[in-house]
Amino acid sequence: MGLKLNISNDLKKSGFMLRQSLLKTSVSNFLSLNASSTMSRAFIRNPKFYSTSSNDTVLYESKNGARIFTLNRPKVLNAINVDMIDSILPKLVSLEESNLAKVIILKGNGRSFSSGGDIKAAALSIQDGKLPEVRHAFAQEYRLSHTLATYQKPVVALMNGITMGGGSGLAMHVPFRIACEDTMFAMPETGIGYFTDVAASFFFSRLPGYFGTYLGLTSQIVKGYDCLRTGIATHFVPKHMFPHLEDRLAELNTSDISKINNTILEFAEFASSSPPTFTPDVMDVINKCFCKNDTVDIIRALKEYASNTSALAEFAKSTVKTLYSKSPTSIAVTNRLIKSAAKWSISEAFYYDHIVSYYMLKQPDFVEGVNAQLITKTKNPKWSKSHEYHFKDLENYFKLPSEYNNGISFAAKGRRKTPLWNYKTYPYL
């Protein structure tokens, strides 16, 4: 990609595999993100989105060995704001060093785990000339997601209801991702002129075949048991059992990842009466089409399926229509990001997210997409580019901006300065 990362030798040592306990090694010394770049798609100075008290927007509970964070903005589907991140991060850092805290549990109050951040407020702030503030807010969200991705104690995400965007970023990189019957998982960014960030590129590139590329480009929602079938979730537990699972995890009083896994299995379901949405035939089409490096070739391959009389023609037609509704820049950048991330470490994925975010927030599709989808609600954004993108045309989106020449830092303040835990393969289970 023509870009060298200024990463220490410790960071280059990837593939570290976690065995019985996440406590064996310490984490920190992150790649750190400079103040002009960091994230939460929730908002900053706007009082509607910037809570004056974090105590009620994030509930914190200590229950035996469990430390439980409940996102508590049910009226806005637990959309994440800056105060919430500022409440969660210091506690996570402190708990990482605590001998009493054994397992972290993340959950959402009401019918949503988290719908992500407030992109409407971000777009309005950009229009008001506050792009640096938006970048700073976005970077805070990356910092939280990276902290969870490299956390040295087991984390369990109870993905009730809507789990999307930045909310997905809280869950996708932790070792235990528990779906239930009403889970709705998605990264919907290509429909608003942005890209699949929070290192979703790392996660998606490690799902079976090219299913992750399909999810990233189409913003497809994956529901319920399909989350387990496709690898998005590690377990499926009926929602009414969540409180009982939480109690059992607290009683364990251990950070042994195998014991935690076995405990979750006590509550898990291993079969579903609902048929799979993504059948082997559908997956075959996805793999044959979304393996292409250029989005124009992906669309061409789908059109070939759409033109025949097979049972898969309707799926292909629908997918082409979906892709044409997305920002051409967004799907092209997302495609390249996910394909490239297959070779990256987790921290490299976050690093490039900061760089790509810098450029994507500058280009007009983000404000246009958010305006059409969420403000005027015309649902018909006028994208700035055509679909004639090629892989090589996207090089500039991955070049370090000159104002970041002093480096990109997304360290969580206060984490110990020991070698960064970095990996290319998820070190769980």
UniProtKB/Swiss-Prot annotation:
Pfam families: ECH_2 (PF16113). The keyword Hydrolase applies. One of its GO terms (biological process) is mitochondrial translation. It is found in: Mitochondrion. Pathway: Amino-acid degradation; L-valine degradation. It comes from the Eukaryota. The keyword Mitochondrion applies. Substrate binds at residues 141, 166, 189, 197. Its EC number is 3.1.2.4. It catalyses: 3-hydroxy-2-methylpropanoyl-CoA + H2O = 3-hydroxy-2-methylpropanoate + CoA + H(+). Keywords: Branched-chain amino acid catabolism, Hydrolase, Mitochondrion, Ribonucleoprotein, Ribosomal protein. InterPro entries: ClpP/crotonase-like_dom_sf, ECH_dom, HIBYL-CoA-H. One of its GO terms (cellular component) is mitochondrion. GO terms for molecular function: 3-hydroxyisobutyryl-CoA hydrolase activity. NCBIfam families: PRK05617.1. Component of the mitochondrial small ribosomal subunit (mt-SSU). Mature yeast 74S mitochondrial ribosomes consist of a small (37S) and a large (54S) subunit. The 37S small subunit contains a 15S ribosomal RNA (15S mt-rRNA) and at least 32 different proteins. The 54S large subunit contains a 21S rRNA (21S mt-rRNA) and at least 45 different proteins. mS47/snr1 forms a protuberance of the yeast mitoribosome and retains a solvent-exposed cavity likely capable of accommodating a substrate, in accordance with it being an active enzyme as well as an integral constituent of the mitoribosome. Belongs to the enoyl-CoA hydratase/isomerase family. Mitochondrion-specific ribosomal protein mS47 subfamily. Component of the mitochondrial ribosome (mitoribosome), a dedicated translation machinery responsible for the synthesis of mitochondrial genome-encoded proteins, including at least some of the essential transmembrane subunits of the mitochondrial respiratory chain. The mitoribosomes are attached to the mitochondrial inner membrane and translation products are cotranslationally integrated into the membrane. mS47/snr1 has enzymatic activity in vitro, and is able to catalyze the specific hydrolysis of 3-hydroxyisobutyryl-CoA (HIBYL-CoA). This is Small ribosomal subunit protein mS47. It comes from Schizosaccharomyces pombe (strain 972 / ATCC 24843). The gene is snr1.
